[in-house]
Amino acid sequence: MRKKLLGFILGSGLLLSVCSCSSVKNIVKISDEADYTKIENSITDVYERVSKGCVGVSVSSSTQSGSGSGVIYKYDESSKTYYVVTNEHVISGMTSYSIYFGNAKYSSASLLGYDATNDIAVLTFHLDILNNDIKDSLYVNDIFSYSDNDLVSVGQTVLTIGCPLGLSNFNILTTGVVSSVEATKISTDSAINPGNSGGGAFNLEGRLIGIVEEKEVWKYSTTRGNYITSDDTPIEGRGYFIALDIVKNCIKNIETRKGAVERPSFGMTVTTINTILDPNTSFKDYLPDDGKNVYFVVSSFDKVSAAKECGVKTYDVLLEINGNSINSSDDIKKCLSTITKNDSVKLKVYRINLGKKETKELTITFN
């Protein structure tokens, strides 16, 4: 699991209970309770079906070994090849890969490719004569038959399946809800632990809605005399999975590339300006007078910058990216997570040039 630096806030709450001594005249009777049996049966049915397409991933090199989880997303009948999606950090630095099906059954696997930026990797395997008996029991989560319009909403039930803390805990089910939805990642309170990485996150219809990636960790340090010690505290109820549209795009790129997929960078720093929180911002004179409160301003460039070479200037305000309005920094991040170095990006920017306000459309290339 990857580590994240998290700000820590302590607070206290006071619960007040108000009681009345007067008689209760109006009693609300709940006649239609939720049919929890149907929900439980749905979870059971989904698990029985999709878990047959969830596998363990065993990896090793000459100096280390580890394990994670994965999901079978495709089977090619002509070549008898199964395709498994997992996390890039599960296979990173490893040279040997195996797929685990439970009940002490393994199959050797090959690395088709990976996308380190988005933490996605694809493995392939074939069933040999020793494992051919499990072919009929395997399930393929055909994610490319799903509509891209399927939305994930806060409060939606999430089923996560994986191998937490090792392959001995094969296909363990945990449940929770969607806590928040970002452009590339979705947070959930479903229990996620080391070993869950690369496992599937499903909805109550049994559709894969993402690939489990990490659990949030609060990293802090303590000074004791002349010594500084650091510690990590896992944050319960704060796990993340990669959104399905990002996963699908990565898989397409990996299958085309058959190797490492490199994502480009604009080579610039973009600062988010909120004029309500910071009305006297130093960028104030560079912002358009359009009634908005949040802006994204180019504040600096890297030594090698595709954006600068293609005409972006310091203090430019980013308005659109590929024809879509930029409403959050996630919009920029999502664009960069789905393009390759062979692609180009269209930017619309607002700038003040020699005292004149103007809007420019620029094309960023990365070659």
Predicted regions: what they are:
Residues 24-33, 51, 74-120, 127-128, ...:
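Catalytic-histidine neighborhood of serine endopeptidases
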Residues 24-31, 39-46, 208-290:
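C-terminal cap/linker of serine protease catalytic domains
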Residues 37-44, 56-83, 105-110, 173, ...:
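A conserved glycine-rich beta-strand in the N-terminal activation segment of trypsin-fold
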Residues 71, 192-213:
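Catalytic nucleophile loop of clan PA
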Residues 110, 252-262, 309-313, 319-321, ...:
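PDZ-domain C-terminal substructure recognizer with occasional recognition of PDZ-binding tails
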Residues 126-148, 264-267, 278, 355-367:
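C-terminal, low-ordered peptide segments at domain boundaries
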Residues 140-144, 190-195, 199-200, 273-320, ...:
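PDZ/PDZ-like domain segments forming the peptide/carboxylate-binding groove
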Residues 144-183, 218-222:
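Flexible, gly/ser-rich surface segments that form the specificity/activation loops bordering the active-site cleft
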